[in-house]
Amino acid sequence: MATAWCLPWTLRRAGAWLLTPPLRCPRRALHKQADGTEFQSIYSLDKLYPESRGSDTAWKVPDDAQQTNKDIPLDRLTISYCRSSGPGGQNVNKVNSKAEVRFHLATAEWIAEPVRQKMAIMHKNKINRSGELILTSECSRYQFRNLADCLQKIRDMIAEASQTPKEPSKEDAALHRIRIENMNRERLRKKRIHSAIKTGRRVDMD
């Protein structure tokens, strides 16, 4: 390996040895590429999350989080986080990114009573013995995104339970009646065939 400093001795002058000024050996220059020309992977954070601008602060809970969720009172929800089994690699073993949101459905005054009753029927498998509706999300490695997904699920449930069935038109009602009559006619035909088969078996045994 060549030394970085070259110290050659010069000729002796006036009874003393003179040293030449140190010379730095040439090194490979590192040229920085122009802005916008550097290589970026398709999986870089700037491309996966263009709004983050390379910073994790974009996924932190903002100070005005309650103002952006006026339709769902966060103070009436029980929010907790735990280990996630979703995407994130080693990150899932270090942070609690899985979000769990629960609230007591029967006493949620911010939801209309008919809507609550319909939600209790439609989502009875998500209600525990205490009457709490439990929602979880682990679609992301960030807590705030999983919390936002749980809140969106609540909005979707409320919107689905708030829909009123449309009154069928005369044509649809007539078609529905014809289908029911055909189903009953086919059911009776199969019963008569089955009864005739059983009667034939009893005659053969006698």
Curated annotation (Swiss-Prot):
UniProt xrefs under Gene3D superfamilies: 3.30.160.20
Subunit structure of this chain's protein: Component of the mitochondrial 39S ribosomal subunit.
Name of protein: Large ribosomal subunit protein mL62
GO cellular component: mitochondrial large ribosomal subunit; mitochondrion
GO molecular function, one term: translation release factor activity, codon nonspecific
Record SUPFAM superfamilies: Peptidyl-tRNA hydrolase domain-like
Record function comment: Essential peptidyl-tRNA hydrolase component of the mitochondrial large ribosomal subunit. Acts as a codon-independent translation release factor that has lost all stop codon specificity and directs the termination of translation in mitochondrion, possibly in case of abortive elongation. May be involved in the hydrolysis of peptidyl-tRNAs that have been prematurely terminated and thus in the recycling of stalled mitochondrial ribosomes.
Family to which the UniProt record says this protein belongs: Belongs to the prokaryotic/mitochondrial release factor family. Mitochondrion-specific ribosomal protein mL62 subfamily.
Annotated keywords: Hydrolase, Mitochondrion, Protein biosynthesis, Ribonucleoprotein, Ribosomal protein, Transit peptide
Pfam families given in the database record: RF-1
Domain of life (superkingdom): Eukaryota
GO annotation, biological process: mitochondrial translational termination
Main location: mitochondrion
Subcellular localization: Mitochondrion
Reaction catalysed by this enzyme: an N-acyl-L-alpha-aminoacyl-tRNA + H2O = an N-acyl-L-amino acid + a tRNA + H(+)
Transit pept. (range): 1-29
EC number: 3.1.1.29
